[in-house]
Amino acid sequence: MLEPPKFIENDCYNGSRTFTWLADMVGLSVDLVNFLICQISALFLASLFRSMLHPSKVSSKLRHTFALSIGLAFGYFCFGQQAIHIAGLPAICYIVIRTQDPRIVQRAVLLVAMSYLLCVHLMRQLYDYGSYALDITGPLMIITQKVTSLAFSIHDGFVRGDEELTKAQQYHAIRKMPSALEYFSYVWHFQSILAGPLVFYKDYIEFVEGYNLLSTPPGNGNLDSSKREVVLEPSPTKAVIRKVVGSLVCAFIFMKFVKIYPVKDMKEDDFMNNTSMVYKYWYAMMATTCIRFKYYHAWLLADAICNNSGLGFTGYDKDGNSKWDLISNINVLSFEFSTNMRDAINNWNCGTNRWLRTLVYERVPQQYGTLLTFALSAVWHGFYPGYYLTFATGAVVVTAARTGRRLFRHRFQSTQVTRMFYDILTCLITRVVLGYATFPFVLLEFMGSIKLYLRFYLCLHIISLVTIFILPKFIRGERRLRTSNGNGNVRLSGSGNTKDAVTTSVESTAALTAGNDLNEDKEEDKHAQCKVHTPTQQQPAAGPHKTTVEQPTEQPNNVNLRSRPQQQQPHLEKKAMPPTCARDAVSVPHDQCEMDQLSSKLKEKIEAETKNIEEFIDKTVTETVSGIVEFKNDLMRDIEFPKLKLPGSNGAISLDSSNGGGLRKRNISSVHDNGTDPGHATADLHPPLEENGAAFLKKEIEVINAVVQQAVPAVLSNGHAK
């Protein structure tokens, strides 16, 4: 019998056992207690990181050092000696990044990282088979995502041109090699070392250096060019509270119902032989749903930690509320109430979806995208047979769902009632399909999963294959033709009634993640939406209601169909516009119009806030200057009044008479002729007092003039000069 190596002891947790007493008290295993202690500590440390270690107060080096130090401490506390792998994998990959040619660095890093991860997966499977204890493979899976995505971003930035990149690839491209401190801080930062989510390198560096709140983020990887306007930093408090409360609710639901629907009972002979088909489907659906709430709890808490440190801001919604979903891993309600597999996949493990899209789906021929994406996802999870059964089944049902949607959906869009019926029906079907496809993922075993599938009579497998290969021969679905502008589709129903069936829509064909090729038109160019402006969009329309339809031509994958460019716009063909918003690059682009609207709303919100600040400064400066000028005028009026009674005099002295000429003239005159004019005998009685008063007022006026001349330009130039 194989004996486990020193750093892997069978049925033995290697992390700290300091809080064993607390684990016994609350009824949880010590590994889960350690995990919760670290995450709760990270939540409070994140607040300190955002406030006391704000980029305006400390250097980026200090922020990097603090983040990676706390991350390493958490890793050692939770995993003990196994934490050596947290250091080993990224260290080897960093050597590869620094030594290999950028033309092949992405492949080399992917090979090294996946090989290291698979070795650890294999050792865990050999020496701790079927264990659900917290182990080192979880953090290693996140680290693998980080180092491989960084390598591909370096390849995109150093080797490929902008015209070859998708919108997301342009945004994440890195053209400056990371230093050792930046690299290891990115890999080990405490916010995501235990449970994710995946943060792309560029987003993390901009967050640490304080550029993540700039109104005009750079479109390339040169993070050191930073003369840009800073917007007001929004508070993440509401988002953090909402996600922490949601995490607690999900933890309660998991603890409450996981004992009612234990997954292990599905392997028992009594369940397989003595229960009805309907109950089997119901139990599979409920058991997998309960397990999902464990992931909801971990992901929501991890997202709250990132938000509390200031990471994750993406702009404002239509009501002006700040949005903190840049790196969110889950949308619970959107997933649980999704009406098709595409929406379900897009809202589950979003960080991994973005990673798979970046590494695989956008870089391989379109016809192989789904298969290769599911294959990498399965290998990344490990060697348990249940993973491969789930992803193989998922690939089949995803393809069937896309075909079925094309065949049937348009038939239910005539009235509001039929649309509602279709949505409810597809929501229920999606729930059943998810339970059917994902129970092998939690069972892990091959034979147990196969036996249960046979008890299901492979119903959904058969229905999926029939939907893919047989139904299209008998049922005519929607036919799609590309419009002349390259951005829209014309849907043609198979019924032949073009008046009622023809509808125009703008749909994204960018690569969807983790097998998300549910875009119903395979012939659409998935990079077409990456062009912000194209010459075809500038051509005059033939009429206000006229749509020109072109027959689709066969083209290789990733080839754009372009019209002849106009002479006045040759530059638009040469270079694609960089993305202007982080959200454009990280979101799964179902709908490009929605992405453009979000970017526009963010820009409008920032402009509105900036305008309010400018108006406030204008008002403040105007009132200040007006007050100073009025004070000056008042003093001048006092000086130029015709009479001024001086102390000790018997009467008023004329200060603006024809023979006096005012206080200034009298002062000057008294200096030059020493008061010999008989017409000024009264004034000559007190020449020292008069000279002192004039000198004092003259000095005050000169000081005020100097203040006005210096203060007004200084105030106006303090970020407010037009």
Swiss-Prot record:
Transmembrane segments: 25-45, 62-84, 104-123, 180-200, 243-263, 378-398, 424-444, 452-472
Compositionally biased intervals (Polar residues): 485-511, 549-570
Region (Disordered): 485-582, 650-687
Subcellular location: Endoplasmic reticulum; Membrane
Keywords: Acyltransferase, Endoplasmic reticulum, Membrane, Transferase, Transmembrane, Transmembrane helix
InterPro entries per record: LPLAT_7/PORCN-like (IPR049941), MBOAT_fam (IPR004299)
Active site feature: N349, H381
Superkingdom of origin: Eukaryota
Disulfide pattern: none
Other remarks in the entry: 'Oysgedart' is a Yiddish word meaning skinny, chosen because of this protein's role in phospholipid synthesis.
Family the entry assigns: Belongs to the membrane-bound acyltransferase family.
Name of this protein: Lysophospholipid acyltransferase 6
Native organism: Drosophila melanogaster (Fruit fly)
UniProt lineage: Eukaryota, Metazoa, Ecdysozoa, Arthropoda, Hexapoda
